[in-house]
Regions:
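Aromatic-anchored glycine-rich loop motif in surface-exposed flexible loops
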Residues: 1-59, 122
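Hydrophobic-face positions in mid-chain alpha helices that act as interaction patches
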Residues: 82, 86-185, 217-239, 246-251, ...
Length: 292
């Protein structure tokens, strides 16, 4: 799964059978030189692996990848491959086991280094050791060297009572810790977006508002189809299927961007939703991010 989302083109149902996927290896052969499969074959291969893992029904947390964690990754997988119904089914099941944080819990938990919290399904940093600490400290140091994107600051400015505004200071320097974790809030966003793709607007709004209600501390107003904000101007202009953003889809993607800020999600969101080209400036030079 991780190789597919990094090294293959984003999944499109209409072209997956023609798009190149990964070389598939399911047995050891030192002389083998497998050619690349199609993206559809790659997805089928990954799903078979997930299903095999689930057959063990592991509940022992010492093995890390228990059945609920496998199902959480399956929700991500179905979401990436645009199997919206299955994405909803698996995400809902795991969301029931890992409840999201309320606003007061979020403040205390989001920057936790080692302490597990009820919403974290799996995380990469679980104990102190020299190598992990070096990587952890390097990540926190490096992120201080570049201000938070003004477009993201403007997005947060639309909801001044959002508890996540504390993720950066007035100089646009991040105060949120760079982390690698899989939180149940992502599952809520998967459900909301999947429902939107299926044309089930009331259900999409329900899950979008479920997360928003836990992040906006004062003067919270639930979104309806009548009061959704205009499409937010950003690099992403189309959804995962290539359709121009609607107000609902824009609201969901913006919520995801705010919630998963500095958690390794943005690159994949750009890839999944149209692969927009854009540029940034550094030291007087222009650097273009081409279609990827």
């Amino acid at each position: 799964y991780n190789l597919m989302i990094r090294y293959c083109e984003p999944y499109q149902l209409q072209t997956a059978s023609e798009t190149l996927g990964l070389p598939l290896v399911d047995e050891f052969d030192i002389e083998a030189k497998p050619s690349r499969s199609t993206l559809k074959e790659t997805a089928d291969f990954i799903l078979k692996g997930f299903q095999h893992a689930l057959s063990y029904n592991s509940t022992d947390k010492n093995y890390i990848f228990t059945a609920p964690i496998t199902k959480a990754y399956m929700a991500r997988f179905f979401f990436w491959t645009q199997d919206w119904n299955n994405a909803i089914i698996y995400a809902k099941e795991v969301l029931d086991k890992y409840p999201m944080l309320e606003a007061d819990e979020y403040v205390n938990a989001i920057n936790q280094k080692l302490e597990p919290t009820k919403n974290v399904i799996i995380r990469s940093y679980t104990n102190e050791n020299d190598v992990a600490s070096m990587g952890y400290l390097a990540a926190q140091t490096n992120v201080q060297k570049r201000p938070v994107c003004k477009n993201l600051v403007d997005l947060f400015g639309n909801t001044p009572n959002d508890i996540r505004n504390s993720g950066f200071n007035t100089k646009r320097i991040t105060t949120k810790v760079v982390t690698t974790k899989f939180r149940s809030e992502e599952l809520c966003l998967i459900i909301a977006e999947a429902y939107a793709h299926l044309g089930k607007e009331p259900e999409a709004l329900e899950y979008l508002n479920l997360l928003r209600s836990k992040r906006i501390t004062e003067n919270y107003v639930a979104y309806t189809m009548d009061n959704l904000p205009e499409v937010f101007k950003q690099n992403i202009t189309t959804d995962a299927t290539g359709t121009p953003l609607t107000k609902l889809m824009s609201a969901i993607l913006c919520e995801r961007r705010k919630e998963l800020f500095l958690e390794g999600d943005r690159w994949f969101e750009l890839k999944r939703n149209g692969r927009p080209e854009f540029w940034v400036a550094k030291d007087g030079q222009k650097y273009v991010c081409q279609k990827f």
